[in-house]
Every structure is written in C-alpha cells, then in structure tokens.
Amino acid sequence: MLSRLFRMHGQFVASHPWEVIVGTVTLTICMMSMNMFTGNDKICGWNYACPKFEEDVLSSDIIILTITRCIAILYIYFQFQNLRQLGSKYILGIAGLFTIFSSFVFSTVVIHFLDKELTGLNEALPFFLLLIDLSKASALAKFALSSNSQDEVRDNIARGMAILGPTFTLEALVECLVIGVGTMSGVRQLEIMCCFGCMSVLANYFAFMTFFPACVSLVLELSRESREGRPIWQLSQFASVLEEEEDNKPNPVTQRVKMIMSLGLVLVHAHSRWISEPSSQNSTSISDHEVTTMLDDMMPKRVEPSMPLWQFYLSRMVTMDVEQIITLGLALLLAVKYIFFEQTETESTFSMKNPIISPVAVQKKQIESCCRREPEQEKTVHVSTTEEASSKEETEAVIKPLPLETSPKAKFIVGDSSPLELSPEDKNTMFDLPEEPRPLDECVRILKNPDKGAQYLTDAEVISLVNAKHIPAYKLETMMESPREGVAIRRQMLSDKLPQRSALQSLPYKNYNYSLVMGACCENVIGYMPIPVGVAGPLLLNNKEYQVPMATTEGCLVASTNRGCRAIMLGGGAKSRVLADGMTRGPVVRLPTACDAAEVKAWLDSAEGFKVIKDAFDSTSRFARLGRLQNCVAGRNLYIRFQSKTGDAMGMNMISKVTEQALARLQEEFPDLHVLAVSGNYCTDKKPAAINWIEGRGKSVVCEAIIPAKVVREVLKSSTEALVEVNINKNFIGSAMAGSIGGYNAHAANIVTAIYIACGQDAAQNVGSSNCITIMEATGPTYEDLYISCTMPSIEIGTVGGGTNLAPQQACLQMLGVQGASTETPGKNACQLAQIVCSTVMAGELSLMAALAAGHLVKSHMVHNRSKINLQDLPGTCTKKAA
C-alpha cells in the first residue's frame, strides 16, 4: 500500500515537472518574504546591538572546526565523483546542485521563518553538508536514465519512487528524531546545530520528493538527442537498476529495528517536551525581578548605523578568518579539478570505451555526387591495398568522419573506411559526370551503348530509368556492374517511399560482398542485419575441444550454454554418434482411382520397383544416393518420401532435383500418374511433424555425458535429485500433457537457432531440427552423479551451399573446423557439425534445467533478457555460474 502511494506521487511529480518546480520555488520565496510583513527591520551589528555571551575561542576549537569543514567539502566532492561513475556527469551534476541549493535555501528559509537565531550557521554549515546524502538521488536518477525512450522516463521515475520512497522516508524520520535529541540538551550551541540538522534532513527529504524528480524528468525530456536508436543519456537497462536495488535492499530486521527505535525516540521527545519541562519550570526558584533583569540585559538595543546597509553586508562578506580562507581555497580547488580536469579525463575514457562509429554520418553523403569507375579498377585498388594501409584507413574512419564529395569525379569506393589512395593509372581512367540529370532518351542511349553502360550514369539518372521501367528494380546489382552501388540506389528509392525517410540510416550496407548473395541468398537487397555473435566453450566432444559460435539477441542464452559446456568439460566431456543420415523429399502424385494409387504403392514397395527408381534417382547426382522409400495412400493421392544422403550439403535443392527425375521415370511405368507437387508436406520441411520425430530427417544424432555430483553442486548450483525430478515432470509429463511432438526438452530450439544463424543454415529449419528428447538419470556408486543424454533425430544441416558461402558464416564454420566439403569422406563435416549442435543443445539443457531446479531462471533473465530495460556488470545468475 505504501509503495503504491509513493508510486502515484512519483508519477504525478514526473508528469508535471514545470508545475512542481515552479510551485517549489514559489513556496520557498513566499516563506522567505513572509516575515517582511511583520515590519521587523532588526539587523544585529548594523542598527541593533545584540548582546551575546562572549567566550574566548580556543585554538583547538578553531582547528576542529576547520577540519570539520574540510571533511564536509571532501565528502561533497566524493559524492559528486560517485555521480560521475554513472556516465552522465552533467545531468546528474546539475540535478545534484539543484538539490543542494534548494535544500540549503529551504533550510535557511524555514529557520528564518521560525525566527530562530542564525548565529550558529557558521558552525552548523559543515554538519549540514555532511548530512547531504546523494545516494538516494543518484539511485532515483539511475531509474530515469535507464529508460529506452522519453515516454519511459516518467514510468521509471514512478517505479524508483515506489522502491526508494518508503526507505528514504523511514531514514529521514529516524535521523530527525536522533538529531532532535540534541535540541533538548540545554547547551545553546548544540541545540542550534541540531536544529539546523533537523531542518537539513527535512529539506533534503522535501527536495527529493518534489524538486529533484521533477528536475530529472524535465532535463531528460528536453534532451532529445539520440545515438544508435536510444537516448544519448541512457546509462544501462532498467533490469540492471532493479537488480542493483534488489541487492542493496535494506535488511527487514534493520527496518523493524529502525521503526522500534523511532517509536522510542518519539516517546523520549514527548516526555521531555510535554512532561518534564513544566515540572522543571515549577522547580526553579528564580524571582520575577531577576528574570526581568536578565531578559532586559539580553534584549537587543537599537543603535544608529555607522555605515550603509550594503557596505555592512559587503564588509561581512570580505572579512574572513584564516579557517574560512582554508575552507574556501579547498572548495575552489576541488571545484576547478572536478569541472575542468576530470571532465577531460572522463570524456577521454568514455571515448575510448565507447567509440561512436556511425555509418549514418558516412551515408549522409549525397548519392548523386557519388562517382564510379570500372569494376576492374575497383578490384585493382582493393587487391593492391596492403593490410597495414587497410588498418590505417579503418582507424582514421573511427577518428574523423568522411568529407562530403563536392566533385562529380567518378571515384566509387566500397566500404565505410576512408577513401583508399588510388594509383595514377586509376585516376587517369576517371571520367566526368554531369551535375544535372540528362534527358531520359539520352540516358537510355547511354545505357544500351555496349561501350558505356550504367556506370556512365549518375544515380539520379539510374533512378529515373528504373521509374520508367527501362531498368528492372531487381536487376540493379547486375545492371550497375557493382552490386553495392545497386544496393545503394535501391535504398535511396525505397527511402522516398517510407513513412520515415531516415528509417534505413541505421541499417548498414557497406563492406559486404554482395556477389555471394546474388542468385543464392537474397533478392532486392537493401543491406545486411548485424546480429551479435557470442561463443560458448570450450565444449569437449569426443575428446576434442570446440568453441561454439552462437548468433542471438536473447540475453543469458550464450552465458547459460557456456556454463553447461563448463560442467560437461569438468565431467570428462561428451560423447556423440550419428545414428542416421538422410534428407527427405515427399512429393504428392495423383492416380485416376484409389486402387491405382494402391497398385503404384505396392510396386514401389517391391524390390523391383525400388531398383528402377533408385537407378533413376542415383544417376542425376554424384552425391545423392537413394536409401529408402516410404509411401502412403490417401484416397487416390500417393505420397512418396524419398530419403537420401546428400554429402556435406543440407541437400534440399539436391534431393528436389533428383526427385523430379525419379518421378519422370515413375510416370514412364504408370502413364496415368499425375505429379501434383514435388513437395507434398510428407517430407516434412519447416513444419512440426511426427514423421520426422519417428523416422528422422537429415542427421539423427545422440550424445551423452556424466556430470559428477561435485560439479552439479558447485557449477550448476543444484542437485542430481532435483534435476532428475524437474526433467521428468517438465520435459516428459509436461510435454506429454501439452501434446508435444518432439518437444521433450527445455529449450533445444534456442541453441539450434543461434548456431544455425551463426553458421549460415536455414533458420526456419529449426522447427524440425529442434526435435529433441532430454533424459536425465542418477548414476554413480552413490547415485549422486548425473547422467544426461540428448537424442535429436532430425537435424537438417550442411556445410556447403546457401548461407555457408558468405564470409562471416564461413568464419564461424572455420571456428569449428567444418567449413566447406570434407576432403576425406563426403558428409563428414556436416555430420560433425550435427554432433556439435546436439552436444551444445545438451549443454544448454543442462544449464537451464539447473537454473529451473535452483529457482534462478527469473533472476537471470531479469538481468540479461529484458528488452525494455536491452544490464551490465551485475552478478546475474547465468554469468555467475559460467565464470
């Protein structure tokens, strides 16, 4: 209930920052000027002689006071240094200054409004500074700065207020009650200082609850600049702040003790102020005459001012003692160091840690002013460029942006780096291009001229030809004779048709070999999608270590899999075997009658029919060899499932081609047979199917490992008994209750998809490839060790063809030593990759099941997998176990 009230308060303050700030300032000014209506113009030392107790100030007191002031200034300095660690010094610094200033002004106004004596301000100021605690303000600012957008700032401030508000309220109450005890001491100086302390605590609390969140909300609302799709002031993600506050959450026992202590202090104050004082007054035996005389002596007496008021204040400001000079000097020195020197160090550190390499700035160059040269010359430039020169150019591209092209000279450069230095021969082959687009007829003649072509046209002219249908949009790469230039023009054409013209600015397209994409991977290309690639390992499989690449945007996945790999490594490694190898294609054919379909099925099931079809099947490819035919009849439809090895290729295209040849041979035997589709979903490809789970498709693999009890306890933070129990009730009973097909596992699809994307596989085939059953059993002499196995009957995978031809994907395959076709045995690399996938799935299963058994799943994903909040440097469960 209390948190809900504070949340509502935080939402209101963050939603109305101007109103709250103006209201706070107005209230402060009103309280400051309220005593002006009393007509009291008394100013001690100027027009009034105010009697006070003259006491000799000891040198030891001066030294102690000076040390106290210096400590207070250093304390404030270190408070702001802690704010700097958040990475946003200016926003938090300004907000912190606002907090300190408003707290000080409010304290002064309250005390002045209550007509209290201000002579103790000099002594109380250090204690006032020492009572300022910016940790709560810093924590609230973290909530605001963890927002992904402007709209989330208010909600996150409200959440932060709901978490921090009750704790801060209790702490402020306890501080006031504890410090307030000093106001009952009877020692005048101590009473004044404690009064200031209470006012300071209340002022800080008031500013924290009203002024500070409003300022933070307003500052972030006015900061519209963004970087890489997120606000430039964003520090981390919201889950990191939640995790940090969860770890720093006060002990409930301590909170109860504070509440009990507060209640006790309230009773002490009530007894001292309302019960003890009357009795003590009654016990005094001072006569009325003595009291009157004492009061007359202490009353201020009016005198004639000896100087103007402004001169009086100026003299008070100029007159400084030695201890005040020392204090002021230290404050100025630390201020200069903080503002000037540490600013440079911070900016340098952040620029080294987070270099902003924005392809957007490079791409802002007008495409019309881009110039081109012959593709042969482009290749010459890149071939002749040394590795050192390339490294130097890339470094320069990070430090400074590319200059805008101002000349229409044909000088087409591929990549985000600075333009490479051209050889004299290349420069001599350049040609001038017109700045204004030429007529359409002239552009058509240049395009059709065999000696010229599209490279003699500007981008604007090419776009006009595409709009006039003289150049098909899908042929831009081939017509331009430079795939990257075709992609750039397509991006410009598409940008004009999008709701937001700058939508493609953050989608990169440079530094990519599109010649490998054309006709193989993608059409109508507008760029490429960078995906983070992590590594899990080492994975000890069949006595060989592997570093497994995983491309994913799901936090905690790689770290969790890495923990499983470590557990397998400490257990002696995993063993794996390929049970079967055969890609399938299941066409559907139609016969005149169901009896005819049954007759064809019987012929295919016979040895004679199988031999005829196999001869036709095998004659088409040097890799494809028909291993099995599986047939079924539905009415007059006949479904034939061809199963064949396909070497190191995944094999869908290969087996589709040979299936057509086999069907043509079948039609020769049965002329009435009509082929409806070469794929009749009897394969089955990219769809859940029991036939893949039972009969297998692609590579059928099994792997196993034994995890010692010590590793289960120390690395997986669980027990064998708990893991076996969760596996039975989750993976077996739970999947059966859900009617799952091949889903008797925890998250095999996670690992399969991540490896598939990294290694250039067909990501959609994770549907069938993720079929897996995970078995866990207690083993060992005392049945405390864990036996785990994963059986995956339909891993559709290959190391040649498709996305495996792209350089980044080839790099990931090379990490595993399975890139390309095997030079020893056809299909060896693909089978090895399938075993790696199965073993990595087992590692992921092991770690996730342990997290579930130990109850760590939610906490780890709060840290690593919260999209609205995309945490850093926090002790999350998965990284803690993987370390």
Curated annotation (Swiss-Prot):
Pfam short name (any one): HMG-CoA_red
Listed GO CC annotations: endoplasmic reticulum; endoplasmic reticulum membrane; peroxisomal membrane
Topological domains, Lumenal: 40-56, 115-123, 188-191, 277-316
Membrane topology: Multi-pass membrane protein
Residues annotated as transmembrane: 10-39, 57-78, 90-114, 124-149, 160-187, 192-220, 250-276, 317-341
Assigned EC number: 1.1.1.34
Positions of glycan attachment: 282
Pathway(s) it belongs to: Metabolic intermediate biosynthesis; (R)-mevalonate biosynthesis; (R)-mevalonate from acetyl-CoA: step 3/3
Reactions that this protein is recorded to catalyse: (R)-mevalonate + 2 NADP(+) + CoA = (3S)-3-hydroxy-3-methylglutaryl-CoA + 2 NADPH + 2 H(+)
Stretches assigned to the Cytoplasmic side: 1-9, 79-89, 150-159, 221-249, 342-883
Keyword Phosphoprotein attached: no
Protein name: 3-hydroxy-3-methylglutaryl-coenzyme A reductase
Organism of derivation: Xenopus laevis
Organism placement in taxonomy: Eukaryota, Metazoa, Chordata, Craniata, Vertebrata
